[in-house]
């Protein structure tokens, strides 16, 4: 068996300082994202669970854009809503499909007359 000598990484003081600064910046970004999530969940009365919650959130988006007097950047404000809206839409699409264990094909379980749904599998 071949053994290798242990390797050491030698960093200058500037390298260490740069790494520490990067780590602190990442921690701050993570904390900011956590605080944003808490803020928007509190503002919307909790996390989104259904399509009715999604509709309520879209109303909140319009209200917040009309009277946004605080210093929060509107792009950051909207990106959080867009993430939630995309999540709800994705969940709705997944809930409308189920995987058949017999034939391993997807079949839509609801809204069979939706001609614009790209995920709708039409049986021939």
UniProtKB/Swiss-Prot annotation:
The modification Phosphoserine is found at residue 12. Pfam families: ANAPC_CDC26. The keyword Chloroplast does not apply. One of its GO terms (biological process) is cell division. Pathway: Protein modification; protein ubiquitination. Keywords: Cell cycle, Cell division, Mitosis, Nucleus, Phosphoprotein, Ubl conjugation pathway. InterPro entries: APC_suCDC26. Belongs to the CDC26 family. It is found in: Nucleus. Residues 40-87, 99-124 are annotated as: Disordered. Component of the anaphase promoting complex/cyclosome (APC/C), a cell cycle-regulated E3 ubiquitin-protein ligase complex that controls progression through mitosis and the G1 phase of the cell cycle. The APC/C is thought to confer substrate specificity and, in the presence of ubiquitin-conjugating E2 enzymes, it catalyzes the formation of protein-ubiquitin conjugates that are subsequently degraded by the 26S proteasome. Residues 47-59, 99-116 have a biased composition (Polar residues). This is Anaphase-promoting complex subunit CDC26. The APC/C is composed of at least 13 subunits that stay tightly associated throughout the cell cycle: APC1, APC2, APC4, APC5, APC9, APC11, CDC16, CDC23, CDC26, CDC27, DOC1, MND2 and SWM1. CDC26 is required to tether the essential subunits APC9, CDC27 and CDC16 to the complex. Residues 64-78 have a biased composition (Acidic residues). Disulfide bonds: none annotated. GO terms for cellular component: anaphase-promoting complex; cytosol; nucleus.
């Amino acid at each position: 068996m071949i053994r290798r000598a242990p390797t050491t990484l030698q960093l200058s003081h500037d390298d260490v300082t740069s790494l520490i600064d990067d780590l602190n910046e990442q921690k701050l970004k993570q904390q900011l994202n956590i605080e944003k999530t808490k803020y928007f969940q509190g503002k919307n009365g909790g996390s989104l669970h259904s399509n009715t919650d999604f509709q309520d959130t879209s109303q909140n988006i319009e209200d917040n854009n009309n009277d946004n007097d605080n210093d929060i950047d509107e792009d950051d404000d909207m990106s959080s809503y867009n993430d939630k809206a995309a999540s709800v839409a994705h969940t709705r699409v997944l809930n409308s499909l189920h995987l058949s264990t017999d034939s391993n094909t997807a079949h839509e379980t609801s809204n069979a007359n939706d001609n614009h749904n790209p995920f709708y599998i039409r049986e021939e």
